[in-house]
Amino acid sequence: MEEPTAVEGQVQLPSPHQGSLRKAVAAALALDGESTMGHRKKKRKESRPESIIIYRSDNEKTDEEPGESEGGDQPKEEEGDDFLDYPVDDDMWNLPLDSRYVTLTGTITRGKKKGQMVDIHVTLTEKELQELTKPKESSRETTPEGRMACQMGADRGPHVVLWTLICLPVVFILSFVVSFYYGTITWYNIFLVYNEERTFWHKISYCPCLVLFYPVLIMAMASSLGLYAAVVQLSWSWEAWWQAARDMEKGFCGWLCSKLGLEDCSPYSIVELLESDNISSTLSNKDPIQEVETSTV
């Protein structure tokens, strides 16, 4: 009579292996839930990239055969479409309220891939969009009797000149550092070209000279550009000072590479926008409520 009771007791007792298995499954589910929530939070915190440059292919330059590029020839174009057409209602992109995404079409005039047509997808505020057309509009404005008015105000005057004098050593140091950095990259790229892509005679003649004269060349270039940037930033108005002070290197390395015929050695590329006068007409037709826009200039 006692044997069935013992059997029943053994059946009712939980197995230690089953308990450990349940704990493992519960822990796995908890970790999976935490990772899923963490992944969702991480997605919501991601910010949309400020800009992306898409290089146009040869088929995209000509409008005569728009249907040729199909299948695998459109990865970069699809990347740009996904970049612009991504749903902004989700919380994945943190788009500022006063910003919008526009497409600026231009040509690389200096640097790598010179002459290449590019589409620049960039986020710009309303103020930045207006500043794109400001140089054209300001050049059309003429002062009465052809005289330039020298006015005094909060944004222009002797106090601005005093400020530029104070910033003179700071601008010199910053320009020296930036010019040294870009100059070193340019020198290294030129050295690689003559060492790996040119003939044996270039390797034994140019490369030793580049190595020997590097300290003299880099110090002379950085010091000259630093002194030039410090003098040029002296101004009467805040706007002119900021335009001159923020351009530390003055595009010298890109200009030097273009003169030497070594555009690929430039540490950066300069893109010239096409038909910038169309920006103002494009902006006038936009709905201010719309957050994401595309304008071709």
Curated annotation (Swiss-Prot):
Q: What residue spans carry the Acidic residues bias annotation?
A: 61-85
Ranges in the Cytoplasmic compartment? 181-210
Recorded topology in the membrane: Multi-pass membrane protein
Which residues lie toward the Extracellular compartment? 1-159, 232-297
Coiled-coil annotated spans? none
| InterPro entries named among the record's database cross-references | TMEM169
Statement: the UniProt record of this protein carries the keyword Zinc: no
Q: Give a GO cellular-component term.
A: membrane
Disordered, as annotated region: 1-85
Main location per the UniProt record: membrane
Tell me the keywords, alphabetical order: Membrane, Transmembrane, Transmembrane helix
Record-annotated membrane-spanning stretches: 160-180, 211-231
| Cellular location(s) | Membrane
Q: Which named protein is this?
A: Transmembrane protein 169
Gene from which the chain derives:
TMEM169
